[in-house]
A protein has these predicted regions:
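Enzymes that bind and transform nitrogen-containing heteroaromatic metabolites
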Residues: 1-131
Length: 131
């Protein structure tokens, strides 16, 4: 399983049940790198990918059905993802929901900088499971 998330500098994901930020460049990059696979998302994330309906499957239990999952509002500590892709906003936003993945089980495999539409720089990090 591959998990894709967006984080601020403190590992925040949400504030008051709302996403911290968004950038269309992230969605474009996610879809561009699907390599023919479907992206599984929750109804919460559907608005982000409405332009990519042929590439996306929306369902409540997407974490148990999908191989590639974009996650915004789920606890991830029990997921045994082989790969975690993080898009970092490179700033701090208010947050009350944080990423709970134990990254001691992962190693940074790749890192790239993206020029965002609403963010000057977005850092993409790809982590592979080592344990």
């Amino acid at each position: 399983m591959k998990i894709i998330i967006c984080l601020d500098d403190n590992g925040g994901m949400l504030f008051n049940n709302r996403r911290q930020s968004r950038d269309r460049v992230v969605c474009e990059d996610v879809v561009k790198n699907l390599n023919g696979e479907k992206l599984f998302i929750s109804p919460f994330s559907q608005i982000l990918f409405e332009s990519y309906e042929n590439d996306v499957l929306v369902c409540e239990d997407f974490l148990t059905k999908g191989r590639v999952c974009f996650v915004e509002n789920q606890v991830l500590s029990s997921c045994n993802a082989d790969e975690v892709i993080i898009y970092r906003w490179n700033r701090v936003y208010p947050a009350d929901f944080y990423c709970d993945i134990d990254f001691s089980k992962y190693s940074l495999a790749e890192q790239a900088e993206l020029e965002g539409f609403s963010h000057e720089k977005i850092t993409k990090e790809i982590y592979k499971r080592v344990v």
